[in-house]
């Protein structure tokens, strides 16, 4: 299968399951039980896949720092497809994430040929106002790529770690591809890694919610994260089968390796370009090791984790641990040791002007189909509903939408409808019905022929009109609140 993903075309993916094997995306349903109060997109299998979301779920459960990052190219009307991404940004922010939103004006300039002024107008009037109206909090950062010095500087550094052959393999670039288009790709990677810069609190898990067409950006960035890091932490085995941790630092300053050795208690061996941590971890080791974390918030977080392990261990006695309990406690101690080591490694790297990026996590959501079937396209007004459409016109679009019903009323009653092929039901699934039980009831009534397309369209049209009216009122309130938000514009 050659399922080429292109961030700049209107993708039409018909079999999402094939993406699991071809691109290494994991099924989201496997991790769903680990997520506290999952979003409706998660519960309804609209989000179908992920990479490394385990670390985000753990951060939400434990209160560890994490970020959500996403971006929008200011190239047209903000519509329901963009709302899906905005909803996920806002949800993660509510769950404790520090939020970063980039307006990809460098991409719009290089790929679409838009002027900087037009990028700013579309960025504010379409995307930023709707993002705030949907609940984005002022604590988050919104920026235009062209005005964000940290992103531009990081993009330049990342550019030294990737060549034209790699970009061609990932994106299909040719000799006709402009240099600015290639630079915009490095800028996208910088967008994704920016939340882990020291000025934003340093190394932490970051999630990027995307459609599968944006996965090339994630694959590139994950590779670049490893290339940029001063050190990498590996789990290794001795000849006898025992486990130990090793910090590899090819090209790292000798002074950085020596400083790192000082901050790891117990049995440690320093080589020319790496350090082996040979100490068998236990409570005493963890209690000493955690004190080597300089950042108070992170140190306190790990102290809490160590206390939880100790509480479990004490509760398991008397008389003694079962074999399972011993394994469970050892596993927690080992995992916590690795996490503390990564924290200390990140701090030492920063002290010596290096990086310690964690490869970004990502979630993948299904595309919405067009209202008339086929692909949703910003260039075809009747295929999508813009968040700035007149509410009455939005309702009319719903009433003109393609359904999954039969040709005649009699056939519908006899054979039932096909809600999974219906763009009207899809609107309710994605956006218009919050209650899962109500949605399930609508679906079953359609399948068994007791609900007709006319009543569904009427319900969806009314809800769409109500949503657009409410959203546009909130957009006007957002316009008045813009000064309360951290927004970096192009100077």
Curated annotation (Swiss-Prot):
GO terms of biological process kind: tryptophanyl-tRNA aminoacylation
**UniProt-listed Enzyme Commission number(s):** 6.1.1.2
The annotated region (Insert) lies at 295-349
- Look up and give the organism this protein is from: Methanosarcina mazei (strain ATCC BAA-159 / DSM 3647 / Goe1 / Go1 / JCM 11833 / OCM 88)
Under catalytic activity, the entry for this protein gives: tRNA(Trp) + L-tryptophan + ATP = L-tryptophyl-tRNA(Trp) + AMP + diphosphate + H(+)
Keywords tagged on the record = Aminoacyl-tRNA synthetase, ATP-binding, Cytoplasm, Ligase, Nucleotide-binding, Protein biosynthesis
Q: What is this protein called?
A: Tryptophan--tRNA ligase
Q: Where in the cell is it found?
A: Cytoplasm
Which residue ranges does the UniProt annotation give for the motif 'HIGH' region?
Answer: 74-82
Q: What is the lineage of its organism?
A: Archaea, Methanobacteriati, Methanobacteriota, Stenosarchaea group, Methanomicrobia
Query: Residue ranges for motif 'KMSKS' region?
Result: 375-379
- Keyword DNA-binding tagged: no
A cellular component term from Gene Ontology for this protein is: cytoplasm
């Amino acid at each position: 299968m050659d399922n080429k993903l292109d961030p700049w075309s209107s993708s039409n993916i018909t079999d999402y399951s094939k993406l699991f094997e071809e691109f290494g995306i994991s099924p989201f349903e496997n991790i769903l039980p680990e997520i506290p109060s999952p979003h409706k997109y998660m519960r309804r299998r609209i989000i179908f896949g992920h990479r490394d979301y385990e670390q985000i779920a753990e951060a939400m459960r434990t209160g560890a720092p994490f970020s959500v990052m996403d971006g929008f190219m200011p190239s047209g009307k903000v519509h329901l497809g963009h709302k899906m991404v905005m909803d996920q940004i806002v949800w993660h922010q509510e769950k404790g994430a520090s939020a970063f939103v980039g307006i990809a004006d460098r991409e719009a300039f290089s790929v679409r040929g838009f002027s900087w002024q037009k990028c700013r107008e579309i960025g504010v009037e379409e995307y930023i106002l709707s993002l705030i109206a949907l609940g984005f909090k002022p604590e988050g950062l919104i920026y235009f790529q062209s005005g964000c010095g940290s992103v531009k500087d990081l993009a330049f550094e990342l550019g030294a770690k990737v060549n034209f052959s790699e970009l061609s393999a990932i994106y299909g670039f040719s000799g006709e591809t402009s240099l600015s288009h290639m630079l915009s790709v490095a800028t996208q990677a910088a967008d994704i890694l920016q939340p882990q810069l020291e000025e934003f609190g340093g190394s932490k898990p970051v999630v990027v919610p995307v459609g599968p067409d944006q996965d090339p950006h994630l694959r590139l960035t994950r590779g670049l994260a490893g290339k940029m890091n001063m050190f990498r932490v590996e789990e290794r085995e001795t000849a006898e089968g025992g486990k130990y941790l090793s910090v590899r630092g090819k090209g790292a300053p000798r002074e950085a390796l020596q400083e790192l050795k000082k901050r790891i208690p117990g049995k440690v061996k320093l080589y020319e370009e790496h350090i082996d941590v040979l100490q068998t971890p236990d409570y005493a080791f963890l209690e000493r090791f955690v004190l080597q974390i300089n950042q108070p918030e992170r140190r306190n977080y790990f102290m809490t984790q160590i206390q939880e392990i100790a509480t479990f261990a004490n509760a398991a006695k008397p008389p003694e641990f079962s074999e399972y309990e011993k394994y469970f406690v050892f596993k927690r101690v080992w995992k916590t040791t690795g996490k503390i080591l990564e924290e200390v490694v990140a701090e030492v790297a920063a002290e010596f002007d290096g990086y310690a990026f964690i490869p970004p996590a990502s979630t993948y959501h299904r595309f919405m189909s067009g209202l008339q079937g086929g692909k949703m396209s910003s260039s075809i007004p009747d295929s999508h509903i813009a968040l700035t459409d007149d509410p009455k016109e939005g309702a009319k679009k719903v009433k003109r939408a393609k359904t999954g019903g039969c040709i005649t009323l009699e056939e519908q009653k006899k054979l039932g409808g096909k809600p999974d092929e219906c763009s009207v039901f899809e609107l309710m699934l994605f956006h218009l019905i919050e209650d899962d039980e109500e949605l399930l009831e609508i679906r079953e009534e359609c399948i068994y022929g007791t609900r007709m397309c006319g009543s569904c369209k009427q319900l969806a049209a009314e809800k769409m009109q109500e949503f657009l009216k409410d959203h546009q009122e909130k957009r006007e309130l957002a316009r008045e609140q813009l000064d309360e938000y951290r927004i970096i514009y192009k100077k």
